[in-house]
């Protein structure tokens, strides 16, 4: 499998310009906050400070997994000198740095030149900056773990791939949005089932400190289910997907589409996994397919939020950098615009921005899905012939090397 190297004339971003943009965003956004900050994050920090680390983790006090709370406890001493909001945002900034480092690692696996400059671009992206500097969220941490898992996929290090998947899920349930990609890879490459156990092992390892402190196992096992139970009856919450559009058109009827949305997402995931068994991609193409998996699931699952496309943002950016084409960067820009538009809709600009975001995401998903959507001449399994690469409507294109036999080749 060939290594993808940026081969266009597009220059890497100037580190000085990236730093300037990031600094301006920090200056503007740092004093601002969202309701989640005062309703959840600050009370959790105060619980850790008032009870002490050991006593705080002896009983449930959050609807987040303990993994994030460990980090919150680690930075809690800073609250003696800084206000609680700044402490939480500093942790989010540290998560953003981890995300940039993970991007650097993924670009290294893809053989990208000037990857340090490209990875630094992450900290200046609006969707990343608003997530950390305004909302104080930890989404960058689970996304960083997912990028590491994709890097391990490119390098065919499957135990590490599954371990990073477990780490990602330990921070946020949204990590499962890219699960169809890893499942497809594991099936296609016939990864031994024993190696799959690295994912739950990593997850359990991160839960162990809380369990030892006295956190009830039953509570840990149901945290994500209880998170889902707190969602309102809306079919989507400012998510840039088709269900937000449905909610705008028919707000009273849209919640009844929950079953249809779930079935559509599961069907799309099954289609994705099946098609991945018969099409082989180069290294950059694999990253593009990981982005497609995140776009499909976040785009079709019900009850998605505006922040849930951050993973797709990062994966499609890595794909664009590795391809090094203007078309690839246009696709990444489309996803970034869609994601950021939905965030601004949540922040008060309302339904028009969410609708714009949904339109961008739908277009990007269709473009990204074209390599898998190109059908064979008939419904029979592919022959041993190697047709030319599947081509998106110019200038959008993935360099698909060839189709595999239906039974797989162990690649």
Regions found by a protein language model. Give the residues of each.
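Aromatic/glycine/proline-enriched transmembrane-helix motif characteristic
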Residues: 100, 109, 228-300
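Extracytoplasmic catalytic/substrate-binding loops of multi-pass membrane glycan-assembly enzymes
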Residues: 31-46, 59-74, 232-242
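Transmembrane helical bundles and short interhelical boundary loops of multi-pass, membrane-embedded
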Residues: 3, 221-240, 273, 290, ...
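Specific aromatic-rich, kink-prone transmembrane helix
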Residues: 101-102, 142-158, 315-316
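Membrane-embedded helix bundles of polyisoprenyl
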Residues: 115-136, 140-151, 161, 165-174, ...
């Amino acid at each position: 499998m060939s290594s993808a190297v940026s081969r266009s004339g597009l220059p890497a971003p100037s580190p000085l310009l990236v730093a300037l943009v990031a600094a301006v965003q920090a200056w503007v956004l740092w004093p601002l906050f969202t309701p989640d900050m005062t309703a959840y994050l600050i009370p959790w920090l105060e619980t850790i400070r008032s009870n002490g680390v050991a006593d705080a983790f002896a009983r449930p006090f959050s609807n987040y997994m303990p993994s994030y709370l460990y980090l919150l406890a680690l930075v809690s001493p800073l609250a003696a000198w800084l206000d609680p909001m700044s402490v939480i945002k500093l942790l989010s900034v540290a998560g953003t740095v981890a995300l940039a480092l993970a991007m650097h690692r993924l670009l290294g696996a893809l053989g990208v030149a000037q990857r340090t400059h490209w990875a630094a671009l992450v900290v200046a992206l609006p969707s990343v900056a608003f997530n950390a500097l305004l909302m104080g969220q930890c989404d960058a941490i689970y996304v960083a773990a997912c990028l590491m898992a994709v890097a391990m996929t490119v390098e065919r290090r499957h135990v590490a791939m599954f371990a990073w998947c477990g780490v990602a899920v330990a921070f946020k349930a949204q990590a499962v949005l890219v699960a169809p990609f890893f499942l497809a890879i594991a099936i296609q490459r016939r990864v031994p089932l024993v190696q799959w156990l690295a994912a739950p092992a990593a997850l359990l390892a991160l839960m162990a400190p809380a369990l030892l402190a006295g956190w009830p196992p039953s509570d840990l096992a149901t945290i994500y289910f209880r998170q889902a139970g707190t969602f309102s009856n809306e079919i989507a919450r400012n998510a840039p997907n088709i269900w937000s559009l449905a909610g705008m058109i028919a707000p009273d009827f849209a919640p009844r589409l929950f079953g249809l949305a779930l079935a559509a997402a599961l069907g799309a995931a099954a289609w994705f996994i099946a098609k991945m068994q018969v099409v082989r991609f180069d290294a950059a193409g694999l990253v593009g397919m990981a982005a497609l998996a995140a776009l499909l699931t976040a785009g079709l699952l019900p009850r998605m939020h505006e922040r849930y496309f951050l993973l797709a943002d990062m994966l499609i950016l890595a794909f664009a950098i590795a391809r090094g084409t203007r078309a690839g960067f246009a696709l990444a820009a489309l996803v970034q615009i869609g994601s950021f538009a939905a965030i601004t809709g949540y922040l008060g600009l309302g339904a028009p921005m969410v609708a714009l975001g949904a339109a961008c995401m739908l277009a990007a998903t269709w473009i990204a899905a074209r390599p898998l959507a190109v059908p064979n001449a008939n419904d029979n399994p592919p022959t041993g012939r190697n047709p030319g690469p599947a081509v998106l409507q110019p200038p959008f294109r993935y360099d698909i090397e060839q189709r595999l036999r239906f039974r797989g080749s162990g690649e």
